[in-house]
Amino acid sequence: MLKITAIPALQDNYIWAIQQGQEVMIVDPAQADPVFHFLAKNKLNLTTILITHYHQDHIGGIAGLQATYPDLTIYGSHEVAQYVNHIVQAGDHLHLLNSDVEVINSAGHTAQHISFLFAQQYLFCGDALFSAGCGRVFTGDYQAQFNTLQRFKTLPESTLVFPAHEYTLTNLKFAASVLPNNNDIREAQARAETLRAQQQPTLPSTIKQELRINPFLQADNLAEFITLRQQKDQY
């Protein structure tokens, strides 16, 4: 059984720690110090880093962690080749923490953004998918991002979704503006407000929940997705 913990970093990042026994791996370390604190507090051994894409708020802690843990195994796509020692691509399967981990093409936010799906149960998706939202399409390749979302829609509804940012309340506000008759969104807003008031993460979400509240997953075609994404960019 994997234990998954959110390590807050920067303003709104989550570094996800995936633990089995005393061994732990992390996803997208924005900073090193919060990870060091987590490891010391829980007496854990860091062995592996997974990187979804090259943006600084996802790789900023790598050098500091490597300085202390020089034998780290670091996985990522070609766009982060300078930071990793194992390059992976969509369709690859890794065996980590006694689990099958599938590498999923999640392009759009960046050209070679990837996600990691553990045991068909846990999706670590970086900035490709947020609760009630998705990442900005910095590449300009809206087709790629739309295709990424279609892939996520095919995952089991019970799949837990672990994005890299706490954007849920802002995203739900936008979602409510474009889907004003969606009761699921209003209920999600109330839950998220309660959690944030208690300084708790709103994440993980599930694919089932995202299909109900995420306007980008409800876009029926590319043109509709582009319209929504451009509206959100200006929101």
Curated annotation (Swiss-Prot):
Binding site for Zn(2+) 2: 57-58, 127, 165
Cofactor(s) required, per the database record: Zn(2+)
Molecular functions per Gene Ontology: hydroxyacylglutathione hydrolase activity; metal ion binding
One Pfam family it belongs to: Lactamase_B
Disulfide bonds, paired cysteine numbers: none
Protein name in UniProt: Hydroxyacylglutathione hydrolase
InterPro entries the UniProt entry points to: Clx_II_MBL, Glyoxalase_II_hydrolase, HAGH_C, Hydroxyacylglutathione_Hdrlase, Metallo-B-lactamas, RibonucZ/Hydroxyglut_hydro
Cofactor binding description: Binds 2 Zn(2+) ions per subunit.
Organism phylogeny: Bacteria, Pseudomonadati, Pseudomonadota, Gammaproteobacteria, Pasteurellales
Binding site for Zn(2+) 1: 53, 55, 109, 127
Source organism of the structure: Haemophilus ducreyi (strain 35000HP / ATCC 700724)
Enzyme class: hydrolase
Alphabetized NCBIfam families for the sequence: GSH_gloB
Family, per entry: Belongs to the metallo-beta-lactamase superfamily. Glyoxalase II family.
Pathway: Secondary metabolite metabolism; methylglyoxal degradation; (R)-lactate from methylglyoxal: step 2/2
Function: Thiolesterase that catalyzes the hydrolysis of S-D-lactoyl-glutathione to form glutathione and D-lactic acid.
Domain of life: Bacteria
Keyword terms of this UniProt record: Hydrolase, Metal-binding, Zinc
CDD domains linked: hydroxyacylglutathione_hydrolase_MBL-fold (cd07723)
